């Protein structure tokens, strides 16, 4: 098929998770349920943090931002997939695909940055408790979040502008249920060397550096706890870090699983199936991890729900 520049009328074909017609209603019901649970759970976290003065601290400020990003992240892919299943159409427009790639990179990158910032917050709280309020002041907290958005915005924009220069064949098939950046580059007809370089740099920035920051923070935390004589103090410190460690392990564990799945099997079907874990399961489980393991969040949610019940 002759390669041509895609226009706004051109489209890609997202092959999805399965071609079996009997599975489509099951997939629709499953993913709709997961989407609603994710949005509701993360909205409750945001409402609990914003409405309860006890949670107006740096840790919960970052948590509410993480919940907002998770809602945006899952909303980038799932609604389109649900519409496609219901309409029995695999089409996605060229601009729709680029928009999906842009926001996927942005929100996935923000997840990594926020997890690193939250690890730094725990490091300051445990290793420098007397200076915590001075170091983690509202100005610094806001600056950390804004700087993360700024960096992610420009990296995502550069990647999309470079992708717009590529040529594709009309009706190109993408073996995924969303426009995953690497899969889109694989089906391009023109040279993608520069795009791959930018993608690798972005992966290093969004993956390696945040992970290094998280590892450094927790190495300092462990070192500080080793010198702590109070068992109660150690337990309290571990309990404040437990939820964050679970979320970090889930996020990077599922991401690594997707990478290994695609590297070992070379199967697009298994890769897209594994992608469900980090694209949908991780954002869905985050609110449960933080609410079930955190007494402050559980208390705030109970007060929020009791106020809602008391309203006429």
From Swiss-Prot:
Gene3D superfamilies: Rhodopsin 7-helix transmembrane proteins (1.20.1070.10). GO terms for cellular component: plasma membrane. Residues 1-25, 76-99, 161-197, 259-271 are extracellular. Keywords: Cell membrane, Disulfide bond, G-protein coupled receptor, Glycoprotein, Membrane, Olfaction, Receptor, Sensory transduction, Transducer, Transmembrane, Transmembrane helix. It is a multi-pass membrane protein. It is found in: Cell membrane. The keyword Aminoacyl-tRNA synthetase does not apply. One of its GO terms (molecular function) is G protein-coupled receptor activity. The chain crosses the membrane at residues 26-46, 55-75, 100-120, 140-160, 198-217, 238-258, 272-292. Disulfide bonds join 97-189. The keyword Membrane applies. It comes from the Eukaryota. InterPro entries: GPCR_Rhodpsn (IPR000276), GPCR_Rhodpsn_7TM (IPR017452), Olfact_rcpt (IPR000725). Glycans are attached at residue 5. Nasal olfactory epithelium. Residues 47-54, 121-139, 218-237, 293-312 are cytoplasmic. Changing residue 84 to N: High sensitivity to androstenone and androstadienone. One of its GO terms (biological process) is signal transduction. PANTHER family: OLFACTORY RECEPTOR (PTHR48001). Belongs to the G-protein coupled receptor 1 family. Odorant receptor. Selectively activated by androstenone and the related odorous steroid androstadienone. This is Olfactory receptor 7D4. The lineage of its organism: Eukaryota, Metazoa, Chordata, Craniata, Vertebrata.
């Amino acid at each position: 098929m002759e390669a041509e520049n895609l226009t706004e009328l051109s489209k890609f074909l997202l092959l999805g998770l399965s071609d079996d017609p009997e599975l489509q209603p099951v997939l629709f019901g499953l993913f709709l349920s997961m989407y609603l649970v994710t949005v509701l759970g993360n909205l409750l976290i945001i409402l609990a943090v914003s409405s309860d003065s006890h949670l107006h601290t740096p840790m919960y400020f970052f948590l509410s931002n993480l919940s907002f990003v998770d809602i945006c992240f899952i909303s980038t892919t799932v609604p389109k997939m649900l519409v496609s299943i219901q309409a029995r159409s695999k089409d996605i427009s060229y601009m729709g695909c680029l928009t999906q790639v842009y926001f996927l990179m942005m929100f996935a990158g923000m997840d990594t940055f926020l997890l690193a910032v939250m690890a730094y917050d725990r490091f300051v709280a445990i290793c420098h408790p007397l200076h915590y309020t001075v170091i983690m002041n509202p100005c610094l907290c806001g600056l950390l979040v804004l700087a993360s958005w700024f960096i992610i915005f420009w990296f995502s924009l550069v990647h999309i502008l470079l992708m717009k220069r590529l040529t594709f064949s009309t009706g190109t098939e993408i073996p995924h249920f969303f426009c995953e950046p690497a899969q889109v580059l694989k089906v391009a007809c023109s040279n993608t060397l520069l795009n791959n370089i930018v993608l690798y740099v972005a992966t290093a920035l969004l993956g390696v550096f945040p992970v290094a920051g998280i590892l450094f923070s927790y190495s300092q935390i462990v070192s500080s706890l080793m010198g702590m004589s109070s068992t109660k103090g150690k337990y309290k410190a571990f309990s404040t870090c437990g939820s964050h460690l679970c979320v970090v392990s889930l996020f990077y564990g599922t991401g690594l699983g997707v990478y290994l799945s695609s590297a070992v099997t070379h199967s697009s079907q298994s890769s897209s199936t594994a992608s469900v874990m980090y694209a949908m399961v991780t954002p869905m489980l985050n609110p449960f991890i933080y609410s079930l393991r955190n007494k402050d969040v559980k208390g705030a949610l109970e007060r929020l729900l009791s106020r809602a019940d008391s309203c006429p």
